[in-house]
Amino acid sequence: MLPATASRPSAEAETTACFSVHAAANPGIMPRVLELFAKRGLVPTSWTSRVGHEQDLMIDIQMQGMDGNLTDYVAACLRQIVGVEVVLVSEKRQSRAIET
């Protein structure tokens, strides 16, 4: 039997930053994009890249647990990379139950 002070679930949002980078299909772009995460000690949760029909490079990156200020800063840095044309940023929140 559980004691009277048993844990009860509460919702806490877990945030995932999502970046969509559109750039010229240049092999030097991918390491420069990854470097922005690596030099902060971060390994992206998900990384997908593909070359489109018009020889443009599309990179989709997800980074779990990244706070909003760092997300905005990394997005600004991505936009400064030569050859990067567009950087879109969004945020996914997933609620999870926590025992308290």
Tell where the protein language model's regions lie, with residue ranges:
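A conserved regulatory-domain signal marking ACT and ACT-like small-molecule sensing domains
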Residues: M1-T100
